[in-house]
C-alpha cells in the first residue's frame, strides 16, 4: 500500500465479491518467490468494493476524486521507466469532496478481456492488477492488488508426432521420435531414440527442457535461455540397433504455455534438447521446438480454432546435422 504522506489518515482496501469462492493460483514474483493470487480467465467479470477506513474519525479527508482501474501491462526490465498497457479500464467512484466517515464503493468491470497469461521472466513481466486511487492536492493515496490470469486451450485438432534422423556423416546416425509436437503442462512426453550407426564412444545421453525468452525488437533484442529440466535417458555406450525409450513427466516442472510475440514485446518458447556426451566430454546436441499449452475444462470454440491453426515452427541451433544434409562437424570427431 502506498500512502505518500497521507497514509496515516485513511486505510484503503480492495475486496472482491467472490473472494471466498474464487480459486487462487501460485505465481512467481520478481524476486523468485511464489505467492498465491486470485485466479481469473479471459472474459470473466471483475467486481468488488473499495473500502476506505478513516484512522481518525474526528478528521475529514479532502480529495479530488476516487477511482478504480483494471490494468494489464508489460514491463521490460531494461526499460523500467515505461509500462506498456494493453488493457486499461477505469471507473469513477466518487466526485471531488470530503470523506467524513469510513465507507465502501462498489465497482464492476464486466466481461474483461484478458488476452495474455500472467508471466514473470528473466527480462520481462506481464501483470494484471486493480488500482484504487484517492486523488489529493499534493499526494495521491494508492492501493494496488495483483491478480493472476491463465489462458486456457482445448486439445489441438492437429498434433502430429516428431520424427527425425540426425547425425554426423560416417560417425553417428540416430533416429529420434516424440509422440506429439504439442503438450499440455501436465502431459507426458513419450518417445524413443534409435541408434542406426555408432562409431563414437558415447557414454551419456540426456534430454533437456529449455525455455527461451526473447524480449525487445530490432537491434534491442535479448535472448535468455533457461534449462528447466535435465532428464537422463542413457548411461553407458549404445550399440547399433539399440532403442532407448523416453518417458518424461512435465507436471513436476515449472512451465508456462508457449507465448509468441505477446503484444509485440516478448516471446517464450520451449525446446527439447537431445544431448550426447562422448568419452572425451564432447557434446553433440539437437534441439527441437515443442508447443506447450494449458489444458482447460471450459470448451471455447474460439480457443479451439486458434489451437487448430497455430503455426508449427521448429527452430533452434543444432550441432547434429540432419542425415540428408552435409554435416557441419568434421570427421575427426569420430573414434573407430
Curated annotation (Swiss-Prot):
Acts as a component of the retromer cargo-selective complex (CSC). The CSC is believed to be the core functional component of retromer or respective retromer complex variants acting to prevent missorting of selected transmembrane cargo proteins into the lysosomal degradation pathway. The recruitment of the CSC to the endosomal membrane involves RAB7A and SNX3. The SNX-BAR retromer mediates retrograde transport of cargo proteins from endosomes to the trans-Golgi network (TGN) and is involved in endosome-to-plasma membrane transport for cargo protein recycling. It is a peripheral membrane protein. The modification Phosphoserine is found at residues 302, 304, 319. Its main location: cytoplasm. The keyword Transmembrane does not apply. One of its GO terms (biological process) is regulation of neurotransmitter receptor localization to postsynaptic specialization membrane. The keyword Transcription does not apply. Component of the heterotrimeric retromer cargo-selective complex (CSC), also described as vacuolar protein sorting VPS subcomplex (VPS,) formed by VPS26 (VPS26A or VPS26B), VPS29 and VPS35. The CSC has a highly elongated structure with VPS26 and VPS29 binding independently at opposite distal ends of VPS35 as central platform. The CSC is believed to associate with variable sorting nexins to form functionally distinct retromer complex variants. This is Vacuolar protein sorting-associated protein 26B. It comes from Homo sapiens. GO terms for cellular component: cytosol; early endosome; endosome; glutamatergic synapse; late endosome; phagocytic vesicle; postsynaptic early endosome; postsynaptic recycling endosome. InterPro entries: Arrestin-like_C, Vps26-related. Gene3D superfamilies: 2.60.40.640. It is found in: Cytoplasm; Membrane; Early endosome; Late endosome. Belongs to the VPS26 family. Keywords: Cytoplasm, Endosome, Membrane, Phosphoprotein, Protein transport, Transport.
Amino acid at each position: 500500500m502506498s500512502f505518500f504522506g497521507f497514509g496515516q489518515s485513511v486505510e484503503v482496501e480492495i475486496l472482491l465479491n467472490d473472494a471466498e469462492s474464487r480459486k487462487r493460483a501460485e505465481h512467481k514474483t520478481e524476486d523468485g518467490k511464489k505467492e498465491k493470487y486470485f485466479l481469473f480467465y479471459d472474459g470473466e467479470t471483475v467486481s468488488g468494493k473499495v473500502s476506505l477506513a478513516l484512522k481518525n474519525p474526528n478528521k475529514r479527508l479532502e480529495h479530488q476524486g476516487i477511482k478504480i482501474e483494471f490494468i494489464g501491462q508489460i514491463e521490460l526490465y531494461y526499460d523500467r521507466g515505461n509500462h506498456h498497457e494493453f488493457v486499461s479500464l477505469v471507473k469513477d467512484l466518487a466526485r471531488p469532496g470530503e470523506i467524513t466517515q469510513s465507507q465502501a464503493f462498489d465497482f464492476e468491470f464486466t466481461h474483461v478481456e484478458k488476452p495474455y497469461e500472467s508471466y514473470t521472466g528473466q527480462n520481462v513481466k506481464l501483470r494484471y492488477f486493480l488500482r484504487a486511487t484517492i486523488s489529493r492536492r499534493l499526494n495521491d493515496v494508492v492501493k494496488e492488488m495483483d491478480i493472476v490470469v491463465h489462458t486456457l486451450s482445448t486439445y489441438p485438432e492437429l498434433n502430429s508426432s516428431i520424427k527425425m534422423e540426425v547425425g554426423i556423416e560416417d560417425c553417428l546416425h540416430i533416429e529420434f521420435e516424440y509422440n506429439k509436437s504439442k503438450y499440455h503442462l501436465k502431459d507426458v512426453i513419450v518417445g524413443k531414440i534409435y541408434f542406426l550407426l555408432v562409431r563414437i564412444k558415447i557414454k551419456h545421453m540426456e534430454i533437456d527442457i529449455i525455455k527461451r525468452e526473447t524480449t525487445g525488437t530490432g537491434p534491442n533484442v535479448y535472448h535468455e535461455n533457461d534449462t528447466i529440466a535435465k532428464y537422463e535417458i542413457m548411461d553407458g555406450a549404445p550399440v547399433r540397433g539399440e532403442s532407448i525409450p523416453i518417458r518424461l513427466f512435465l507436471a513436476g516442472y515449472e512451465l508456462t504455455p508457449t507465448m509468441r510475440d505477446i503484444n509485440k514485446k516478448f516471446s517464450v518458447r520451449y525446446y527439447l534438447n537431445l544431448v550426447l556426451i562422448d568419452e572425451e566430454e564432447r557434446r553433440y546436441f539437437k534441439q527441437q521446438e515443442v508447443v506447450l499449452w494449458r489444458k482447460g475444462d471450459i470448451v471455447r470454440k474460439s480457443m479451439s480454432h486458434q489451437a487448430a491453426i497455430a503455426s508449427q515452427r521448429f527452430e533452434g541451433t543444432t550441432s547434429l546435422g540432419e542425415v540428408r544434409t552435409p554435416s557441419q562437424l568434421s570427421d575427426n570427431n569420430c573414434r573407430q
